[in-house]
Amino acid sequence: MKRVLLKLSGEALAGEKKTGFDEATCIGVAKQVKQLVDDGVQVAIVTGGGNFWRGRTSETIDRTKADQIGMLATVMNCIYVSDIFRFAGMETEVFTPFVCGAFTTLFSKDKAVEALNQGKVVFFAGGTGHPYFSTDTGAAETAGASSLPVNTTGIKSA
């Protein structure tokens, strides 16, 4: 079974709107991913949070707090996009490296691999769960833990 990890930047989710979500763009992404799923590909997705928050540009907020806000922005993105995917006919599950109540599942390698094997599109939100790391770092870390291929030249943000 082939597995892939996709990184969707927050800016990509915002489309022409530049902030928030562009529903038409997100539906378009869902249709493309559905083709992969229908072809038997196991899909995991990491999102950025730049459509809601760019902490590195803040001059007044502590860097740790700014990064935590960014992590939560990725959670919002994954919850939203996962629901768009459900609307498009896919099963999904959102994982985070920290407890997020009833909204997400706490990440474990076994649970993530099980969800992939069940045919679910798996979303990894919250980055590494630690400040000072980009969502790309979180994507690479989670990919390694979940036996997902990682391009050694970097992760392409779409």
Residue ranges and their predicted role:
Residues 58-122, 137:
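Ligand-binding beta-strand-loop-alpha-helix segment within the catalytic cores
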Residues 12-14, 50-55, 101-102, 131, ...:
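Short, active-site-adjacent cap segments at secondary-structure transitions
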Residues 5-9, 44-48, 95, 124-127:
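Short beta-strand segments
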Residues 37, 79-89, 141-149:
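Alpha-helix C-terminal capping segments
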Residues 40-44, 119-122:
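Loop/turn-to-beta-strand initiation segments
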Residues 110-158:
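Internal active-site segments that recognize and position negatively charged phosphoryl groups
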Residues 1-43:
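N-terminal glycine-/serine-/threonine-rich phosphate-binding loop
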